Amino acid sequence: MSAKIIRIATRQSPLALWQANHVREMLVKQWPNLSIELLPMITSGDRFLKDKLLSAGGKGLFVKELEEALLDKRADLAVHSTKDMPAQLPDGLSLAAICKRDNPFDALISPRFKSLDALPKNAIIGTSSLRRQSQLLAYNPNLQIKTLRGNIHTRLSKLESGEYQAIILAAAGLERMGLAHHITQLIPDDIMLPTCAQGALCIECRTDDLEIQELIHGLNDPISALCVHTERRVNAKLGGNCHIPFAVYCTITAEKLLLLRAKVLNLDGSQMIDDEQQGKIEEAEIIADRCTESLMTKGAMSLLSTIPS
């Protein structure tokens, strides 16, 4: 690798900076003489945090400015939470590495109640995710869902102020920030299936930048990448945005088989369509397509058409 400085585009939130520094540390461990700088940026998603992402434009708002920095060569690579990535990337950009996946599950945080089952009737639960909202209401229709936005510390502060009885956050973000002690319950995946790629960091770069791709190749975790790309394939075929209550989770079983589960719900959780597929690892794309076709046959697109755009 040449002596040039490598620039990593990242959001400015504390979690995003932690993630970018984590990738920098892994790169320097592999390439000790590498010079790396962070290029922190405020994205459209950060500016819209107080608004509904549904009306503002969805999850792609958290990566748009970072991708522009890649395309105009102000940055050499960008670090993202893969769950924030749109199903379709801009021409000229690729996901060159999926880092080893951290905790993919959702966490209940409550100062008073130790589990979902302990929450009282009409308890106010904070989340901005339609996926979490619909699955919470499917499990307990007596809960009250209230929008919760901001970075991790802001959300925890709102909980502590008494605005909510409990909030739901991604466990991985809390663990990365040293805030795992706030977790009251890891929500079982039979109650709340994760979103596409939750818990996985990805590294995006220019498709034609073979030097950078070689640099970050060692950070790619093959199993995590297989599972994430399988989830993203289903997500893309079902519309590929955060406007829909859709969950998908892929794992490798003890028997070395690929297990893929997905579900689509309406907003109040009263209707749900789910599917489970299993097969050989080398048939991941076939399994993803089979899962998608099964969901569609069961009426997933009709159910999704009831979700306001």
From Swiss-Prot:
Gene3D superfamilies: Periplasmic binding protein-like II, Porphobilinogen deaminase, C-terminal domain. Its EC number is 2.5.1.61. GO terms for biological process: protoporphyrinogen IX biosynthetic process. It catalyses: 4 porphobilinogen + H2O = hydroxymethylbilane + 4 NH4(+). Pathway: Porphyrin-containing compound metabolism; protoporphyrin-IX biosynthesis; coproporphyrinogen-III from 5-aminolevulinate: step 2/4. Binds 1 dipyrromethane group covalently. Disulfide bonds: none annotated. Its cofactor is dipyrromethane. GO terms for molecular function: hydroxymethylbilane synthase activity. Keywords: Porphyrin biosynthesis, Transferase. NCBIfam families: hemC (TIGR00212). HAMAP family: Porphobil_deam (MF_00260). Belongs to the HMBS family. This is Porphobilinogen deaminase. It comes from Legionella pneumophila (strain Paris).
